[in-house]
Every structure is written in C-alpha cells, then in structure tokens.
Amino acid sequence: MFQFHLTSKAKKVIELYAQEEAKRLNHDMVTPEHILLGLLYESEALATRVLMRLKIDLDRLKLELESAMVKSSTTKVFGTLPTAPRVQKLISRSAEEARALSHNYIGTEHLLLGLLREESGTAYNVLTSMGLELTILRQEILKMLGVAGSNISSMEQTSQEDNVKKVKTPTLDQFARDLTKMARDKALDRVIGRENEVMRVVQILSRRKKNNPILLGEPGVGKTAIVEGLAEKIVAADVPDILLKKRVLTLDLSSVVAGTKYRGEFEERIKNIVLEIKKASNIIIFIDELHTLIGAGGAEGALDAANMLKPALSRGEIQCIGATTINEYKKYIEKDGALVRRFQPINVEEPSIEDTIEILNGIKGKYEEHHKVKYTDEAINAAAVLSKRYIFERHLPDKAIDLIDEAGSRARLLNMTRPQEFKDLEKKIEELNQQKKRVVESQNFEDAAKIRDEITSLQEELSKKEEKCREEREKIETFIEEDDIRHVISEITNIPIKRLLNSESKRLIGMEEELHQKVVGQKEAISSISKAIRRSRAGLKTSKRPLGSFIFLGPTGVGKTALAKVLSEFMFGDSDALIRIDMSEFMEKFAVSRLIGAPPGYVGYEEGGGLTEKVRRKPYSLILFDEIEKAHPDVTNILLQVLEEGQLTDNFGRKVDFSNTIIIITSNLGARDIVKGSSLGFNAVGSEKDANDIKNFALEELKQNFNPEFLNRIDDIIVFHTLSKEDLKDIINIMLKELNEAIKERNIVINLSEEAKNYIIDKGFDKKYGARSLRRAIQKEIEDYVSTEILFGNIEDGDTINVDRNDGSLIFSYDKSVKTENKELSKS
C-alpha cells in the first residue's frame, strides 16, 4: 500500500487495527488518531512498551483519545477505508525519524515519534496532555534500542523477520518450558528485589564470550526467581537491545533422560537441543540443578550431557544459565575445570528479614486468591521474623513463603468443615438407596417409586443448602493473623504454642515459684538459673551463645538431674526435650567422636553424631551432661565452641546451632566434703558461713580438674547442698503423690501421717545417698506391704489406706468403700 518499508507490526497497526478503529467509530477515513488507537492494541510493539516504561496509563490514554474523537452517527462503512492526507504526512515524518536513527525500516516506535512531531491534531494534544515529550520519548527509544544507529530493531524485526519463517524447535517444545511466555501470560509470581543479581545476569549474558552465568546459593534463597525476574524484564523491554528478542527456556533434564532405552537416544536428544538453539539464535537455556549435567545419560563408552554441551558453550553457540547449591557446585562442577571456566558464578545470598517482608507483601496476592483469605501486616511480619528464629536448616524467603501458604491452607480447611446437617442428609439418602435396592429386588415397584421421589427431594434439599452455605462462606472474609502463623510454626517445629506466645514473659517472672513446686530445696540453684534464663529471654545475652550454661555440683540424690528435667519441661513444654548424655560412656579418648559423628571410613559415619543429630532435630532442648568428671578431658575441648559460639560442626561439615539450648553439666566433685560439712544429714540452721566454705572448697576442686578456658565460658557454677528435714518431708509428699497416681485406676488412696513421714526419714534417709534412699524406704516399708494385701484381697478397689507410726513400726488402717472396717497391723 505504501512505498515505505514497514515492519510487520507497523503494517498490522495501519492496515488492520486503524481500519477497525475507524469503522468502530463510524468514521469515513483513517486518521493518525486511529493509528494511535491501533498502536495501543499491539501490546508487544516497541511503541507500547516505551509508553509503559514512561509510566503512561494506556487505558486512560485510550479513554481520553476516544472522548476527544466525535463518534459519527452516519451509517457504518464497509470495505477498506481510505487514508487521510495527514496519515501520509505522518508516515513521511516517521521515515525521517527512521533515517535519523540509521534504520532502514519504519517501526511502531517511528510512528509514535511521527505523531508527536505533528504538533497539532487530537492525537498530539492527548499525548502531550499525558506529559509525553518528543525529546524524552526519543531518548527512551534509544535506550531500549541500545546504541543509536543500530540497523537491527530488537522488538520489531526488519525485513529479514518478515521474509524468514520462525524456526521450529520441536525438541525444546517437548523438554522445556518458555519462561518469557509465562511472564507474558502473567503465570509467574512477581519477583521482588534481587535487582543487583538480575543486572549481573544481564551483564554476563551481554558479554561476547563466556556469557553463561551460574547462580550459586543455598536452597530456597531464590535462584530460580532471579531467572524468572530476567524473563519479566525481557517481556517489559527493560534489558539491552541484545536481549530484547531472547526467549528464556527452562530445560527439564530428567525428561530428556527419561525413556532413552537404547544407546544413542540420549545423545541424539541433546544434539537436537543444541542444533535448535543454534538455529533459533534467540534462546537462553536455563538448567536448574546444573550439577545433574555431570554424568547425565553417560554410559560405558558414551558422553554425558556436560561433555556434549562443552564445545557449544565454549564457542558461544548456545547461552546457558545454571543454578545449583554451593555444596553441589564444589562436589561436582569444581572438579571439572573445563566446565567451570565456561560459567561465571553469581553468589545469591539469603535475603534479610526486611527484604523477605517486602517479598511476601509482593506475592501475597496470589496466595490470598488461592486460599480465599487476607493476610494482615502482622502475619506477614511474623512469618519473616519467626521463620528466621525457629526454622533451621532452611533459608529465607522460602521458609517464610511456606509459612503463609500453610497458614492460608489451615484457615481455609477450618472454614470448610462440613456441617453435621449435611452429613445427616447424606446418610439418610444412602439408607434410602439401600432400602430402594431391597424393595426393587422384591419387585415392589410402587414403594420403590415413592422412595425414589423421596431421595430426589432430599438431594434437591441438600443441593440448595450446599449452595447457600457456599454463598455464605464466600461473603465471609477470613483474615490470617499473627497467631495463625505461630500455630503453623508450632506444628512444624513441635515447639509448644505457649512457648511462642507473648504470655511467656509472665511465666518467666514466676519461674522460681513454678520450679519450687517440683524441686524441693536448692533455692540458690533455682534462683541463679531463673535469673540467667530471664536475661537471655529479655535479649540481654550474646545472640550466638546458648540460652544458659551451668555446672551443678553436689552430692548424689539432692536434685541436680531432677532440676534439669523440670527445667526442660518448663522451658520447652516437653519432658522429651531433655537430651541426656551419660558421660561415663565417654571415658575413652576414641569415644569422644561419637558426640559429633565418626570420621569418614569409620563405622557409624553415616549415622551422624549422638549430640549434633539430636540438636539438629530438636534445636529447642535442654542438654544434660551427667557426671562430666567421668568423661575423657577431650570432651571439654569439644564443648568450648558450643559454650562460646553456640555452634558445633559435625562429621558431615554441617554447622549445628546451639543458641536455643540450655546446657547443664553435673558433677560430684567435692561431694564427700559437702556431706561432711552437714550436720546429721541436714543443713544446720545458721550455717551460712559453713555453706560458703563448702562451696569454695567445691569450686577449688572443680578448678583442679578442669581447664580455666572451660570454666570461664560457663554462665554459673551452682553448688547443691544436702537437704533439710523439711525438704525431705516435701520430697516424701511428692513421692506419695506419684504412688497414688500409679494406683489411681483402682481408686485406692494412701495417706501418711507426720509421724509416719518421720519414721520413713529416720529409717530410710542416708546423707551419703540423698533423697534416692527415701524412695527405697517407701518401697520397702509401704509399697511391699500394700501390694501383698491387694493380692490377698484385704485391700479392695476404692479403699483408703491410712499409715501411722506406733513406736518402732508403721500401722495401716483401711477405710472401706462400702462400710468402714479398721484393721491394725503391726509392722516390725
């Protein structure tokens, strides 16, 4: 139609879209205004992309342009409309712009420049009213085209594009996904941040040689998202001209290998992929988990995928983006120097909490749409902060995204609970179906018809109620709050929910009182531990160190291990959170390696360390090193970095975090002297000076047996004293409570008088063995007798047993459940 050489998109705008717009508005000829409307229809045109980059609202531009153009009331015109003289002038101006840019074609960008050079008319007025200036537009077009004077338009190809057919890529279509197409179709999640990494990828891809980037980072930090971000930038034309027409395809290597039964099939597939990339010349291939190239498809006498791709990569015939973890890169790729030099590494670090919050805010819309919920700002912040604090061995933003995803899923499932009314109706319909089946078998068709009608009525009723319920649910807006995120973390990590709630501070304030209910005596020990724990939970501890580290000194049976068990249940809500390591198992030097795992080549290497594996699985726990003086001295050397840095490297090279553990070390050093310093097995009243002397002696004993660098890293050294008589009575009450709990099923209750308790103490307590001797005394004096009487039938279910003292023995009386019958039996 025109003597000028137009690109395919420019032809389509003038000859198709502009014609359609003129006919739609009942105009009798095509004007520059119709051409501008046509440009807006061609979403992939460079002109449209320039307007979008300049923040021009295309919908508003279209509305203002249409409102400025008067729609004719005449009859619609059919056939091809003539063009106004202004269109000829527009194309002449566009040709001048093309010549100024040393282009041998007229593209949509030149048409847009020509419209702004008109300096009159509706199209010009609307464009300028939107803030568009000729100079700014020309500069932006030059930026997108790259260097001025280029003879190749990256967005709208020259006559070569018009004449050459699109290269077919059947193998790639089968084994790869087009990320640029997915970005164009809005099928990818938004990529927030990572501007530096994306620009580094663009820089490497724009190199002349060795233009293959490889993304290195821990799992979940967003390596694949960077490639998706590149695809989005290509679609938005926010890349240099050399990349504007590129397609980013992600290759599924497992699919390439799958189904290759015979020798040569895999090699043929790889060869076809390379040939198709060469022919297309606009494809960037992305291979996730690049280390799988090493050895992929390799057999005896055959090449693997990596060796087949090396020549093409070195000559720059194909461009490849790789992604893998740092460990896999070292293990597989670094060993192949020829492959390493063909890729340029880009380190992808874990984003900060602030960046993660920004990422979550950017992508939450997709999850809100999927789960039909709304995420509050508090929930988004909690997902980033709490996932960083409580979920280990995974990385942001992946673990935070998983949290909001699962919280949305959980809320949706809670709201979708099927009402009991529906279940009852379905059950009734099922029963009627069974009844109808029996009636039909008996050939009573009249009753069967009645049952059928009843079933139909019930099904209609159920359908209406379900529809009503669905409509009501859609009206309800479900909000994901901070507590929902905490519940999900509790389910993932097995940390009790109360541990995650803010009410924990109230529990910590009353910590001593709660511990005293289960641990008798040892006020100094409980007070010291409570203060240390409060310091750490208030944020006053060094971030990397454990929550607290203590050495418990004292004779056996005074409550060292008992306090550790109670403390683990108080802090972590679970008695199983106690990791108890008996140091008598580590008396030999070679046994020390069992804590962190056997070295390579030794038995048990794959099993990991006895300490490190347990802490990896339960990072919130209390670690009890029982009777450390029995262990080999090298054990204390291993504990040095745990106490100071809060981490330990296991035999696999993994760093295990101890910053959320409490470490308690027990020892019996100086126990004999502590016992000797007590009066008659009980602490003497007013013996504070003696207690201090005993403590100082025990500490001196500790210094003689352990290195200063070990003791210097401990938060507090606590000396447990022997128990007073009142303490022993409290312990008997606790043991009696446990005994009554054991026989609770038979409704039997045992009561002890004060005299009976004194008898147990006099008979059973030995200051050398502590409170454990009381347990043996209760077993011998009470449990043995009661068990015998139960077997003889003298004590029945529901009886109450009262135990008292009579001179040198205990007497037992029974309160029967039906009638009271007293028996007094002497036990010598």
From Swiss-Prot:
Keywords: ATP-binding, Chaperone, Cytolysis, Hemolysis, Nucleotide-binding, Repeat, Toxin, Virulence. InterPro entries: AAA+_ATPase, ATPase_AAA_core, Clp_ATPase_C, Clp_N_dom_sf, Clp_R_dom, ClpA/B, ClpA/B_CS1, ClpA/B_CS2. It holds the Pfam family AAA_2. Residues 426-461 form the UVR domain. Residues 172-419 are annotated as: I. One of its GO terms (molecular function) is ATP binding. Residues 480-671 are annotated as: II. Residues 4-147 form the Clp R domain. ATP binds at residues 217-224, 554-561. PROSITE patterns: CLP_R, CLPAB_1, CLPAB_2, UVR. GO terms for biological process: cellular response to heat; killing of cells of another organism. One of its GO terms (cellular component) is cytoplasm. Residues 83-147 are annotated as: Repeat 2. Residues 7-72 are annotated as: Repeat 1. The keyword Repeat applies. SMART domains: AAA, ClpB_D2-small. Belongs to the ClpA/ClpB family. ClpC subfamily. Bacterial hemolysins are exotoxins that attack blood cell membranes and cause cell rupture by mechanisms not clearly defined. PANTHER family: ATP-DEPENDENT CLP PROTEASE, HEAT SHOCK PROTEIN 104. This is Hemolysin B.
